[in-house]
Amino acid sequence: MSRKKGNAADLAPSRKEKKGIGQYILGFFLLLYTLFCFLPVLLVFIAAFSDEKAILENGFSFWPEKWSLVGINSVLKYGDQLVASYAVTIFVTVFGTFLGLLVMAMFAYSISRRDFRLSRFLSIYLLIPMLFNGGQLSGYIIFTSYYHMKDSLWLLILPLCVTTMNVIILRTYIANSIPNELMEAAKIDGAGEYRTFFQITLPLLKPSMAAVGFMMATAYWNDWQNALLYITSDSKKPLQLLLVSIQKSIEFLLNNTNVPAAARAAMGGNIPQYSSTMATVLVVIGPIMVVYPFFQKYFIKGLTVGSVKG
């Protein structure tokens, strides 16, 4: 017995130390790919702090001839409105993601139960929006004329709250990764459906919910079309719609030949078309880039674990 243990101990270090040349080659190409993906983000950051005249004369560069804060200031000058839009976007993103995850998790749980009579009907009902779409006009008429929800934050939350693909991801995870015997045991112990869902299924569903939640949060964060259709108050204007307004105001200045000389001098002699565009991109992607690394492992695990039946 001791000899067998000794042989196993001798083999263990050799397995750890052995690394084929293929792993080094793979690591090298992955490093190159990482740099390839990071360089555009770096260029956006540099261009946001570049002088507009230098961009017009020499194009975008990783080391511009002249640095300038005109582009970023053209966005930050909206101070109070920018803070209010950030607050609206964060609220819509957090609350919409939480509400959507709760509703979709309950929906996915119900259609994953084999003993639920309406499981097949609801599964077919779930697929209808993927095949048929009423379009924006019908949705606009229903929300504004019948529900009277014009200029309401609910119209930034409800349209993206439930999506077919996210429900399918959650349902697949429940069916493939959570043993049905666990739910049957809870039922035998006297647990109802709500208790089984909240105390057993929901805690085990966290990896998949993290993946779906990140995709939902990204969709809410980048949504500007619903705000453009339904929001009219400045106090309810989300970040994306504000940035669209900033870009339109810059385009107006570019197309207006009667811009005062003092205004042009304040902008460095040139209207910051490209630098301000990069500054708006930086304002948008900054928070997502900060948050994503913390959810990356859950995002990958949630998409892969439920895809293979164990």
Indicate residue ranges for each PLM-predicted region.
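A hydrophobic, multi-pass inner-membrane permease signature
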Residues: 2-310
